[in-house]
């Protein structure tokens, strides 16, 4: 079933991509990444059941002693709007593969690409009836899903504020919650980095999908010897990136998801300028289309630097040495993704060891994901649980049982 589902994602990629453009404001290349990743998630999940899922345990008694993994029963999946297909299927596929039923609640704004399309693909792939249910809805629906006694594990991807509520509710009902939450990821550009490549990486990390990605590069930490040229190069790229409707024209950035999010972005940008930051590029919008924005001369307390913006905003802060870089990069409640750019890989890895982060990329920006890799953050970015990779998925969607077996009934003195 999962292999057939993977093939269907590939077969219907164009149709499903259109829905991602229409609902989520994706540019076609980003939509293509989502459908390709959905296929890969299904192919990877198809092999999960053949992985060794238990162990033989030594016992002082004359018996066989085993630790084995069993399905939890029903898994509740709550997925967001920004990458609606990837962030749903990465839990749905492995949960099904490991013998569970799934109840999926997509964001109402992306109910087709993050929910109904998934149900249709699995239906066409031959998934038995009743194993996957889709419940589009708002906060009330999510609360009901977490509280339902049939749901034993909750997989949630969304904001840190919402994740805290999900975690609290799950704890009250004594069920596991796997939380992948917000971030304010740093890209650290060391003094020996290739400037042109660094600027390109920084632009991609901050402006891809309008900055509406949990691991978006939200903070640019640049060595003081490169900072002026880095800001100029990043601002030039921002000024020339086309913004518009990806359903009608070829653009680099599409629309912000709604007016509420657009207004939050603009409020943080204007508050940052009021606090002394210099607007090097952008800072304006037309409807839901927000120009990619570069802020220079920021401080650690500048609003767009200190908070997760979830928009196409690149605040640039300078540092003088590695100690200052480590302190600045680690000076946040979040710990999702980190990028470090340097010609000296050993130096970059040593710096990475000093900065708490669930994901680290040496000589790359902060946005990356693969079906085979464990994904998740620390601190306010998550509970340390992981999505992706066989070990993480088995841990997330099964329970451990201790099983002993004897050939005859044990004799006792009573």
Each PLM stretch: what is its role?
Residues 20, 42, 99, 132, ...:
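Residue-level signal for inorganic ion chemistry
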Residues 24, 134, 191, 258, ...:
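A structural signal for short, well-ordered beta-strand elements
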Residues 151, 188, 242, 269-270, ...:
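Conserved C-terminal structural/oligomerization subdomain of aldehyde/semialdehyde dehydrogenase
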Residues 161-299, 362, 409-413:
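ALDH superfamily catalytic-core signature
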Residues 53-197, 319:
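Rossmann-like NAD(P) dinucleotide-binding subdomain of oxidoreductase/dehydrogenase enzymes
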Residues 1-63:
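N-terminal Rossmann-like NAD(P)+-binding subdomain of aldehyde/semialdehyde dehydrogenases
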């Amino acid at each position: 079933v999962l292999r057939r589902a993977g093939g269907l994602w590939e077969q219907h990629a164009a149709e499903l991509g259109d829905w991602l453009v229409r609902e989520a404001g994706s540019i076609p290349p980003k939509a293509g990444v989502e459908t390709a990743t959905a296929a890969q998630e299904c192919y990877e999940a198809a092999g999960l059941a053949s992985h060794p899922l238990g162990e033989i345990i030594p016992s002082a008694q004359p018996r066989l002693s085993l630790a084995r993994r069993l399905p939890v029963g029903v898994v509740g999946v709550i997925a967001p709007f920004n990458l609606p297909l990837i962030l749903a299927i990465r839990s749905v596929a492995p949960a099904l593969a490991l013998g569970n039923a799934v109840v999926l609640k997509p964001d109402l704004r992306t109910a087709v690409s993050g929910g109904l399309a998934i149900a249709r693909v699995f239906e066409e792939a031959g998934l038995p009836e009743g194993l996957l249910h889709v419940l589009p809805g708002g906060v009330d629906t999510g609360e009901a899903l977490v509280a339902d006694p049939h749901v034993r594990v909750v997989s949630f991807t969304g904001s840190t504020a919402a994740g805290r509520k999900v975690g609290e509710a799950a704890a009250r009902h004594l069920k596991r919650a796997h939380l992948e939450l917000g971030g304010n990821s740093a890209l650290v550009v060391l003094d020996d980095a290739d400037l042109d490549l660094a600027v390109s990486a920084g632009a991609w990390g901050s402006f891809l999908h309008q900055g509406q990605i949990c691991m978006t590069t939200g903070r640019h930490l640049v060595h003081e010897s490169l900072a002026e040229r880095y800001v100029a190069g990043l601002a030039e790229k921002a000024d020339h990136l086309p913004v518009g409707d990806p359903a009608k024209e070829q653009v680099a950035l599409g629309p912000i998801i709604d007016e509420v999010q657009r207004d939050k972005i603009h409020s943080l940008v204007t508050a940052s300028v009021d606090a002394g930051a210099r607007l090097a590029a952008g800072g304006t919008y037309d409807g839901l289309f927000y120009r990619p924005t570069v802020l220079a001369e920021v401080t650690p307390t500048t609003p767009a630097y200190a908070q997760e913006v979830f928009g196409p905003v690149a605040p640039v802060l300078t540092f003088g040495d590695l100690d200052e870089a480590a302190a600045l990069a680690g000076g946040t409640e979040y710990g999702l993704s980190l990028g470090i750019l340097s010609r000296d890989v050993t130096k970059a890895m040593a710096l990475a060891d000093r900065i708490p982060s669930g994901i680290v990329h040496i000589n790359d920006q902060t946005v990356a994901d693969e079906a085979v890799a464990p994904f998740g953050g620390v601190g306010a970015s998550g509970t340390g649980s992981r999505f992706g990779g066989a070990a993480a998925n088995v841990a997330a969607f099964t329970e451990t049982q201790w099983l002993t077996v004897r050939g005859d009934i044990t004799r006792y003195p009573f």
